[in-house]
Amino acid sequence: MPLEPTISLMGRARWPHAFAWAAIRDQGVPIAFGTDWPVSPLDPLFAIRCALIRRPWADDMPDQRLSLRECLAAYSQGGAFAEFGEGVFGAVAAGLAADLVLVDGALDRLGSTRPNARVVLTVAAGRVVHMAEDLDKREYA
């Protein structure tokens, strides 16, 4: 995503507080990721990539990047926490809603210059709600 016009409109005095994920984490505050669609893309893998490769906007600004594990937790457990749904969803565990995605590719390469991961299957409340056209057609229980 291009930095302009965002950084100019925001003003340098606010830069240290923008996307301050590491600072928030360091204070023990749970982090929940989502989307500001249509302002930003509706693609969690893109958002995770941004959190992994984010660089300070100036040399005197703090590094606010998160690890892949922290990003995945922000989308799963963090989302459940934000919606008061920790006992309902947010993890793969017995008794919780069966919400999950199947990713084709290496998640650990999202921060590389050539990421190759893509979502090929999405299950929400135990039902398939998205299946990539090139995914083998099989029955899912």
Where are the predicted features?
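His/Asp/Glu-enriched, well-ordered alpha-helical/loop segment
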Residues: M1-L107, T122-A125
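Short, Lys/Arg- and Gly-enriched loop/turn segments at beta-strand edges
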Residues: L107-T113
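Glycine- and charge-enriched low-complexity intrinsically disordered segments
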Residues: M131-A141
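Short, small/polar residue-rich loop motifs at catalytic or cofactor-binding pockets
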Residues: F84-G85, P115-A117
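Short glycine/proline-enriched turns and hinge-like loops at secondary-structure junctions
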Residues: D43, T113-P115
